[in-house]
Swiss-Prot record:
Residues 658-669 have a biased composition (Acidic residues). The lineage of its organism: Eukaryota, Viridiplantae, Streptophyta, Embryophyta, Tracheophyta. This is Heat shock 70 kDa protein BIP1. It comes from Arabidopsis thaliana. Residues 1-27 form the signal peptide. Belongs to the heat shock protein 70 (TC 1.A.33) family. DnaK subfamily.
């Protein structure tokens, strides 16, 4: 029997954006359009990038030699910093250093998680059009607001540049991962961040699914049930999958998009803040610099406690010249976070129930995310599965990027025979439906439905002579729409007037291979229909905003380039001046070969240049270049004369002919 909805009732639409079921033919078709496709794990606290190359995955180290990069962005009076450089200066520049932005992306400003985070971070989170924006001072004291997508785009750009430096070519295509329990708005916002970073996001896939690929890529043999337990810096996912000779089928997923290592750090920080207040009668909770130092040391202590039973948290001059030194035991750390650790078991139970499996049917428990190194978390998981040891065979920091890179290899065609049999069957994490009479959430696509999928249901009118139905689309698990999330709405007009219950209106939900949901409503009698793909109804960035942010990102990149050129020009001048200074005083080089006032001329030129450098710390590239030419105009003719007198070829101070022992030019530290 057809269900009814009133003139003002609604149909729920949800868009689930993630990667998915793909047939080999479609992968080959897509590969013809794509270049090399990198895999990026865009994490709350750290990010990682990999590429499928020469038959295997390469996890790519950044310019500091590290395979994971802090998801931090800092602004100073002269430049923008991303990664280690941003994190390292956070303690002295807290209000202008942004981190944990993944906890804001795709959320509304009034979300309770956002309001909680506002009190915990040193930078300002402000309300703009109902969304949380980050307000910071950039160069020259100018205040600017950035969307979470823009900050995420800066991190994605860093990962893109890391891959480009390794591969020696420009990259435009990427697979980007998201927590399995991310809702539609968070997925769409992540895709928008990719666009701002100049990337075509070829696929968004779920982090636990990517990790399962990393675990199961080389696993042959029979069917295996695995549970992926992914506890990272800011988010938590559990997925239950069946792996069978390259087919990865997700049976269920659950999680908490606001639970992770950052929460454990905050508990330790709160403990020490109270201790300081008690011992020193000093409240540091509003002192951003002190909190920055404490945050850094609490994170270090947490990591150390995974392998030690006690650490000492020591911070020189934490506040008012007072040095801080306190022990922290593993037992105390576990006590402070006991409820949070136990909270992770709830989603495990729900995922198991939804998958319809008994504990004994799980063949492997795969640990992903840095927080799974915590012994207490491992113990709780082991106890839940009645003594079964978790598998520690995958690198918890790199597994997600590894799986994303495999997916990238499939999409680009670079995966070849090694990946040709892989098939991913992922699921929609949240139920999608429409509102019917009385505000009831009528489900069309239940959670954990394999995607792509298409579901239709016939509805009817609630009032006599009703000619319009207003359809609202929701996602969520509650029975009433007021407790679910509205994704969008549209009207179907022109229904021929008829008694209530007579018209037949077919509503179709279709989630494609990318997890995008399209909703169509059609009046069967008249053939009149309307379609919707959710876009701006969710507070998503408009195309105009995205275009503006892309332009600004390009301007930032240009600015970063100029800063580097300026530093290089200054270094070139300094190197030349010091090199000349050393040569005129070195008997093995120029000291004994100079005649008349040649030495005085060089010394005067180098002295004047060094004094100019001291007074012009922040000059433009052109000024440094000009000053270098001035010094060279004095020194180079003298050097040429010296070499001609001694029968050698002429050469500048920095030239390879100046002495045989001259080292080749290196960037200075």
């Amino acid at each position: 029997m057809a269900r009814s909805f009133g003139a003002n009732s609604t149909v729920v639409l949800a868009i689930i954006f993630f990667g998915c079921l793909f047939a080999l033919s479609s992968a080959i078709e897509e590969a013809t359009k794509l270049g090399s496709v990198i895999g990026i794990d865009l994490g709350t606290t750290y990010s990682c990038v990999g590429v499928y190359k020469n038959g295997h995955v390469e996890i790519i180290a950044n310019d500091q030699g590290n395979r994971i990069t802090p998801s931090w962005v800092g602004f100073t009076d002269s430049e923008r910093l991303i990664g280690e450089a941003a994190k390292n200066q956070a303690a002295v520049n807290p209000e202008r250093t942004v981190f944990d932005v993944k906890r804001l992306i795709g959320r509304k400003f009034e979300d309770k998680e956002v309001q909680k985070d506002r009190k915990l971070v040193p930078y300002q989170i402000v309300n703009k059009d109902g969304k949380p924006y980050i307000q910071v001072k950039i160069k020259d004291g100018e205040t600017k607001v950035f969307s979470p997508e823009e900050i995420s785009a800066m991190i994605l750009t860093k990962m893109k540049e890391t891959a480009e430096a390794y591969l020696g070519k420009k990259i435009k295509d990427a697979v980007v991962t998201v927590p399995a329990y991310f809702n539609d708005a968070q997925r769409q916002a992540t895709k928008d961040a990719g666009v701002i970073a100049g990337l075509n996001v070829a696929r968004i896939i779920n982090e636990p699914t990517a990790a399962a690929i990393a675990y199961g890529l080389d696993k042959k043999g029979g069917e295996k049930n695995i549970l992926v337990f992914d506890l990272g810096g800011g988010t938590f996912d559990v997925s239950v999958l069946t792996i069978d000779n390259g087919v990865f089928e997700v049976l269920s997923t659950n999680g908490d998009t606001h639970l992770g290592g950052e929460d454990f750090d905050h508990r330790v920080m709160e403990y020490f803040i109270k201790l300081i207040k008690k011992k020193h009668q000093k409240d540091i909770s509003k002192d951003n610099k002190a909190l920055g130092k404490l945050r850094r040391e609490c994170e270090r202590a947490k990591r150390a406690l995974s392998s030690q039973h006690q650490v000492r948290v020591e911070i020189e001059s934490l506040f008012d010249g007072v040095d801080f030194s306190e022990p922290l035991t593993r037992a105390r750390f576990e006590e402070l976070n006991n409820d949070l650790f136990r909270k992770t078991m709830g989603p495990v139970k729900k995922a198991m129930d939804d998958a319809g499996l008994q504990k004994s049917q799980i063949d492997e428990i795969v640990l992903v995310g840095g927080s799974t190194r915590i012994p207490k978390v491992q113990q709780l998981l082991k106890d839940f599965f009645e003594g079964k040891e978790p598998n520690k065979g995958v690198n918890p920091d790199e597994a997600v990027a590894y799986g994303a890179a495999v997916q990238g290899g499939i999409l680009s065609g670079e995966g070849g025979d090694e990946t040709k049999d892989i098939l991913l069957l992922d699921v929609a994490p949240l139920t999608l439906g429409i509102e019917t009479v009385g505000g009831v959430m009528t489900k069309l696509i239940p959670r954990n439905t394999v995607i792509p999928t298409k579901k239709s249901q016939v509805f009817t009118t609630y009032q006599d002579q009703q000619t319009t139905v207003s359809i609202q689309v929701f996602e969520g698990e509650r029975s009433l729409t007021k407790d679910c999330r509205l994704l969008g709405k549209f009207d179907l007009n022109g229904i021929p007037p008829a008694p209530r219950g007579t018209p037949q209106i077919e509503v179709t939900f279709e989630v494609d291979a990318n997890g995008i949901l399209n909703v169509k409503a059609e009046d069967k009698a008249s053939g009149k229909s309307e379609k919707i793909t959710i876009t701006n109804e969710k507070g998503r960035l408009s195309q105009e905003e995205i275009d503006r942010m892309v332009k600004e990102a390009e301007e930032f990149a240009e600015e970063d380039k100029k800063v580097k050129e300026k530093i290089d020009a200054r270094n070139a001048l300094e190197t030349y001046v010091y090199n000349m200074k050393n040569q005129v005083n070195d008997k093995d080089k120029l000291a004994d070969k100079l005649e008349g006032d040649e030495k005085e001329k060089i010394e005067a030129a180098t002295k004047e240049a060094l004094e100019w450098l001291d007074e012009n710390q922040n000059s433009e590239k052109e000024e440094y270049d000009e000053k270098l030419k001035e010094v060279e105009a004095v020194c180079n003719p003298i050097i040429t004369a010296v070499y001609q007198r001694s029968g050698g070829a002429p050469g500048g101070a920095g030239g390879e002919s100046s002495t045989e022992e001259e080292d080749e030019s290196h960037d200075e530290l």
